[in-house]
Amino acid sequence: MASIGFFSLVLTLSLLSQTTRSIEKAFFQDDPRLLYTLISRQGHVYISLPDPISFSDQMSPEQAYFFFRQVYATYSTFEFYADSELPVLAKENSFIFKARWSFKNKKNDNQHVLQVFFHLAREKPPGRGIPQPPWRITEIKAEPL
């Protein structure tokens, strides 16, 4: 019985690790399409980013795609990395992934650094096809460093 629990934990962390690596890749490549694939399809995602972006609102996954397309058109990522190897456990079936995002304005080369928090939740698929639901972004918050 303990081995089943351990296997479940290892599988959960493995899937979570794949998600966090995909988030890192989306930011490094300034790729709103990849980020869009990681956003929850169940409801709206809350996004709150301080200056220089200065935005806070709930939006659909499609709106988030267009929002990040505009962000990546204005700013270029030059550093994005996780603050810790494992995400912080928020509650059952959800985690907070904390990362440092450094980016610069493409027009004037002003550099900015934010601490970004991604709330990740397990999203149940509509059918019974996937035994382990994927981790999806339900919230993105940031604060200046």
Regions found by a protein language model. Name each.
Residues 1-22:
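Bacterial Sec-dependent N-terminal signal peptides
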Residues 62-107:
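Surface-exposed, charged secondary-structure patches
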Residues 16-34:
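Short, aromatic-enriched amphipathic alpha-helices that serve as compact interaction elements
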Residues 26-29, 58-62:
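Soluble non-cytosolic domains of exported or imported proteins
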Residues 39-53:
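Short, solvent-exposed secondary-structure junction/capping segments
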Residues 22-25, 50-57:
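Second-shell loop/turn segments in exported
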Residues 109-145:
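Short beta-strand edge/turn micro-motifs at domain boundaries
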Residues 28, 32, 40, 44, ...:
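Sec-exported extracytoplasmic/periplasmic mature domains
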